[in-house]
Amino acid sequence: MHPILFPPTLDNIRKITASLVAAAKASGHRRALVLSGDREWCLQAAQVSLASTSLEPVLWIAAQAPENAWRMEAAKAHRSLGQEVDAIVFDAYSGFDLDAFGIITGAIRGGGLLLLLTPPLAAWPSFNDPEHARIVTAPYEVTEVTGRFLKRLVRILREAEGVIIIEQGKILPSVPFAAPARAETGGNPPSPGDSACRTEDQGRAVEAIVKVVTGQRRRPVVLTSDRGRGKSAALGIAAARLLQRGLKHIIVTGPRLDAVEPVFRHAQRLLPQATVSRAALHLPEAGMEFAPPDDLIRTSRPADLLLVDEAATIPTPLLERLLQGYSRIAFATTIHGYEGTGRGFALRFHRVLDEKTRGWKGLRLETPIRWRSGDPLEHFVFRALLLDATAAPDSAVASARPETVAVERLDRDALVRDEATLSELFGLLVLAHYQTRPYDLRHLLDGPNLSVYVMRYRGHVVATALLAAEGGFVEETARGIWEGRTRPHGHLLPESLAAHLGLAQAPRLHCARIMRIAVHPAVQGQGLGTHLVDTIIRETGGEGLDYLGSSFGATVELLRFWERLDFLPVRLSVKRGATSGAHSAIVLHPLSSSGQALVKRARERFLVHLPHQLADPLRELEPQLAAWLLRRGDPAGPLPLDSQDWSDVLAFAFGRRVYEVCIGPIWKLTWGALAAPESATLLGEVERNALIVKVLQKRSWQEAAAALELSGRAQVIEVLRRTLRPLVLHFGNEAVRREAERLAGG
């Protein structure tokens, strides 16, 4: 690019902006203008730039904006979902919020402009960004948050096509000549099948959703797209068409109400007679409403059609339960971007669809609606935020095994310069974790408390783990955490151990939390994850840490993985996560004698609380999960039953007395037996589950029968009796066994 040799006067800035917007309108693309300098200069230059155009509306994402301007704080950027604007002014002086930036840039339509206001580019990486407060954790200061991400961003800005940079006091850039503008800035012509649709893609999507209702049951459709392709609009248009045809009740679900509001907005546009509230649309004898995924699973609300928007942000187990509960479903999700990580969704959920449905249809929306294909702003945002980060090709890593890989702790100064490794690493995190978002990229690069481990095979990343340093508080702060007076940001393990298990010493010890761990899908099940954690245990053991830990949505598979590495479960949240639908588990592994004592005490306290929690807040916990949490590694010693207790158990087990008058001793035997490893060979799954749902969780006979897929009380009692008999013979003393044999023969 050849510079124009004149100073950056406001008049010249005005001319450059006008030329840039003309080029944008001619191409149907969006453009970006970076104004870099002192804050007051940036604000003045932005106003002058906009005054040279007819762009309207203009949205300011900034802490301050001109009088009467439409302004929105970055934290509220999600409210722009589904809206279209001609221009956005994004003030990086107010904080470069990556999540907001990813959201808000998608609202600019073709022919529009992004104005990015920044500190002087050379100094921006060392700028005290307000976003640092989100990244920093005690005992670090905000000044210790590095500028690696911003350094990378500046490099990408300078390399990007369609981005013009004007720096205060420096020579102005040239701007490509603008060809005459064309009126059309959209994608393909509207589908002839539906006048409300703006592209052929969208028309096909609407037809596919309608077919879900009019065709055979249990044949869902899955819509995928990049942002700006009209996916949510297709859901809304299809919903309106179906309601017009007489469908009675549609439920819309998604990660949050604001994420699905575009669905309601597009339906309302075609149903002007409808009464609309924020979470519902009502017609005289029909309507559609929003419900969170966990509510749908808990309450089993009936619906003629379930629309699941941003499905990638919902954990696969929840999606599977929705699939089981509703016979007519349309799923939609974003492949790239802040709304979800669609590639991981495809990997996880398509297998479920293959197993659970009679046949499902996948449909990809390719054509942009708000701008033309090949948009340079979209390309820049994808690259800057790594929205298109991709794990290594399957073929390149398929032969990786523990003995052929190398594990290293990365130098993040080198990582930020190594785009290939960064993309493969972040691509793995995207595949493995449904909640990965752009903020995580900045945290990964700049968080002073983080360590990044990678496992390589022939130069490619096959696994990665992120560790966060936690704990190490002085006595006064530790006591404040234990008493609930303070909750330091970013110290999940010590805070939970102190606040939930009452372990006052926990915040004083030093630990590391394995925040994320991901193994390439092509080599999962080969022991690479175990090898990675084993390496981390060895490396961190000599660094003054007392214990390692992790927190995750509890499943039997994950608990089994951590148990193989000698990580013990010490906590299970009493409520399910609103978005995950899972209870959060904490597992710990000691590294020092102090850590050993803490882990032992934490496990003891957990087992003190667990039996009472199973009978109260955890009554609906999956019995398979409860059984795993109860397990002990060592064989059971004598159980706390006296001779009268054994007599009561025998009386029920052999049909001499009813359950209700023997319940105490039965509970004692159940609790002790299920904690013993030998119970796995003594009991089948149905028998074990019967003890958990009825004896430990104290569900009603009807609830227990439903959980066990039995007809009622009599069948549950029969299962309990046959379950207790082998336990009596195994755990009882010689006298108890003789009495059991007598009753069995009598």
UniProtKB/Swiss-Prot annotation:
KW Disulfide bond (keyword) present: no
Binding-site positions, ATP: 202, 228-237, 370
Enzyme class, UniProt record, top EC level: transferase
Taxon lineage: Bacteria, Pseudomonadati, Pseudomonadota, Gammaproteobacteria, Chromatiales
Pfam families, sorted: GNAT_acetyltr_2 (PF13718), NAT10_TcmA_helicase (PF05127), TmcA_N (PF08351)
Residues holding acetyl-CoA: 517-519, 524-530, 557, 564
Annotated protein name in UniProt: tRNA(Met) cytidine acetyltransferase TmcA
GO molecular function: 18S rRNA cytidine N-acetyltransferase activity; ATP binding; tRNA binding; tRNA N4-acetyltransferase activity
EC number(s) given by UniProt: 2.3.1.193
